[in-house]
């Protein structure tokens, strides 16, 4: 499986074992292609790109440094190949969009230092400084409308968790533990947002129609919902009960991480298929399998206790 990127090709093939060290001697630098194995990722690129800027790569391919080559002619570079395509794009174009993640910018900075790509190094350092100066550790938007919520979820490349809490929606009095449980739900949401903010979009909703409800989104659609409220009878009077289903909330949060993008390639469909996620399922299904898929793809709505089931119960 190979992916094209400009004048480079990247593959995950494994090189042959036999190697030798030589000084690189190339002809026709404007047209000659070079085969590179960077930490197991294979790239084709041109001499023109490699020697365009004054970097370690230019030194390697102008004969000033020795290079290690395997028996199939692949030049071996003992570095992680994850960001090498970005390095090549920068050498070719003179600029690249930087990753959003601080961790990935730091990884790219380390590669820029190794290859002595001064311009990219300075851009990464400036981006990290801006993040330190202007960006808080954790951002949690509080939505103002359903359209804003839809836009946030549709445009995010992360899975999303939304907590809706709105005490003003209650028509009855609360049970004795409801206020404490409401606070526990809010506190857990805050803890999860601090722990997973780099991987999950967390959203607060204080204008919705529920009293306390968690929603979980993957690939732009709702995957599961945990409703924490129910109506109970106490001394012949209806009351609203808020519960704190901590284990269920943790379970659905971990499930939603299956929809996390993998190095910009989208979620791991094999993992989704193995764990029952709808996105990983085959499109070639018979009628029974199709019905089962539709059942699974419906939103998992978990109500701690259903009001209908409790309509005739008295406490």
From Swiss-Prot:
What family does the database annotate? Belongs to the BACURD family.
Subunit composition and interactions: Homotetramer; forms a two-fold symmetric tetramer in solution. Interacts with CUL3; interaction is direct and forms a 5:5 heterodecamer. Component of the BCR(BACURD3) E3 ubiquitin ligase complex, at least composed of CUL3, KCTD10/BACURD3 and RBX1. Interacts with DNA polymerase delta subunit 2/POLD2. Interacts with PCNA. Associated with the tectonic-like complex (also named B9 complex); however as Kctd10 has not been identified in all tectonic-like complexes purifications it is unclear whether it is really part of the complex.
Q: In which pathway does it act?
A: Protein modification; protein ubiquitination
What is this protein's function? Substrate-specific adapter of a BCR (BTB-CUL3-RBX1) E3 ubiquitin-protein ligase complex. The BCR(BACURD3) E3 ubiquitin ligase complex mediates the ubiquitination of target proteins, leading to their degradation by the proteasome.
Extract the CDD domains matched here.
BTB_POZ_KCTD10_BACURD3 (cd18399)
The organism of origin for this protein: Mus musculus
- Motif PCNA-binding, which positions? 239-245
Asked if Endoplasmic reticulum is a keyword of the record, the answer is: no
An annotated GO cellular component of this protein is:
Cul3-RING ubiquitin ligase complex
Looking up Gene3D superfamilies in the UniProt record yields: Potassium Channel Kv1.1, Chain A
- GO molecular function list: Notch binding
Q: Which UniProt keywords apply?
A: Acetylation, Nucleus, Phosphoprotein, Ubl conjugation pathway
Question: What Pfam families does the annotation carry?
Answer: BTB_2
Cellular location(s): Nucleus
Modification type N-acetylmethionine: residues: 1
Looking up InterPro entries in the UniProt record yields:
BACURD1-3, BTB/POZ_dom, SKP1/BTB/POZ_sf, T1-type_BTB
Annotated positions of the Phosphoserine modification: 23
Q: Could you tell me the Gene Ontology terms of the biological process aspect for this record?
A: angiogenesis; heart development; negative regulation of Notch signaling pathway; proteasome-mediated ubiquitin-dependent protein catabolic process; protein homooligomerization; protein ubiquitination; ubiquitin-dependent protein catabolic process
Q: What is this protein called?
A: BTB/POZ domain-containing adapter for CUL3-mediated RhoA degradation protein 3
Region span, Disordered: 269-294
Q: Which residues form the BTB domain?
A: 32-100
